[in-house]
Every structure is written in structure tokens, then in C-alpha cells.
């Protein structure tokens, strides 16, 4: 891998994102589509931009992302985590600010499995006393 490129892997729920930071003008490409084209929701676009806005590097990098698995929210979170890791690979001094904002820690919440005899993970059939 060349020195002009920084890499970070991000995960959230079942989504995994591979993020490449290259010096550029601020283009964000996700699975060969633009950020606005890939995410319909403004909240998802905002989540992806958060680490860049915090570190004031929005116009400094072109970001290339491949993301698989999960849904819209999980993919946005995975991309944010990947961008955070790539930024720390680029400049370790950004770590404290990113950690304070809560972007460094991987969100470990996963879907709870469905149990036998229950309708969902915790939803039980109606109880009849008599």
C-alpha cells in the first residue's frame, strides 16, 4: 500500500466498511456511487461526515469506501468507524478528539437471537393464569 493512502476498517451491527483516505478535494465515493446517491437519508449522510467535520478535514481527503452487509443505519455507522480509524492512521494526534466524541469505540450492540418457544427474542406468547 502506498504512503499517500490511509486505510481503516469499520464495523457496525452486520455491516463492514473498508475505507481508503487519499489526498483530494472532499469527494466521498461509496461502492462507486456518490454519498448523496448512496444514502437517501440526510441523517446517514451526516453520520458519515461527522469525524471529518470534527477534525476539520472535510476538503482535505477523497474517500473511497466499499461497504457490505447490514442496512442503511448500520452501513453509515460502519463507514463512520472506518473513517475514524483511517484518520487515526493518518494522524495519531486526532485520536483524543475522536475518542471524546465517541467515534473510536466500536458500537458492540448486536441483534439478540430469537429463542425457542418465544415469538421474538423476548416477546412471549400471552400468559393465561387459568
From Swiss-Prot:
Keyword Ion transport: no
Keywords from the named record: Ribonucleoprotein, Ribosomal protein
Annotated SUPFAM superfamilies: Ribosomal protein S5 domain 2-like
This protein's GO CC annotations: cytosolic small ribosomal subunit
The organism's place on the tree of life at top rank: Bacteria
GO biological process, one term: translation
GO molecular function: RNA binding; structural constituent of ribosome
Entry's family note: Belongs to the universal ribosomal protein uS9 family.
HAMAP family, alphabetized: Ribosomal_uS9_B (MF_00532_B)
Name of the featured protein: Small ribosomal subunit protein uS9
Organism: Pseudomonas fluorescens (strain ATCC BAA-477 / NRRL B-23932 / Pf-5)
Encoding gene (name): rpsI
Amino acid at each position: 500500500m502506498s504512503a499517500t493512502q490511509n486505510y481503516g476498517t469499520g464495523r457496525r451491527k452486520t455491516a463492514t466498511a473498508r475505507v481508503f483516505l487519499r489526498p483530494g478535494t472532499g469527494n466521498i465515493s461509496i461502492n462507486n456511487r456518490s454519498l448523496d446517491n448512496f444514502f437517501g437519508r440526510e441523517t446517514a449522510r451526516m453520520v458519515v461526515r461527522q469525524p471529518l467535520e470534527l477534525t476539520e478535514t472535510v476538503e482535505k481527503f477523497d474517500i473511497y469506501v466499499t461497504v457490505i452487509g447490514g442496512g442503511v443505519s448500520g452501513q453509515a455507522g460502519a463507514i463512520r468507524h472506518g473513517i475514524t480509524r483511517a484518520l487515526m492512521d493518518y494522524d495519531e494526534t486526532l485520536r483524543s478528539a475522536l475518542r471524546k466524541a465517541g467515534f473510536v469505540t466500536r458500537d458492540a450492540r448486536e441483534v439478540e437471537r430469537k429463542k425457542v418457544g418465544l415469538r421474538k427474542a423476548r416477546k412471549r406468547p400471552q400468559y393465561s393464569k387459568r
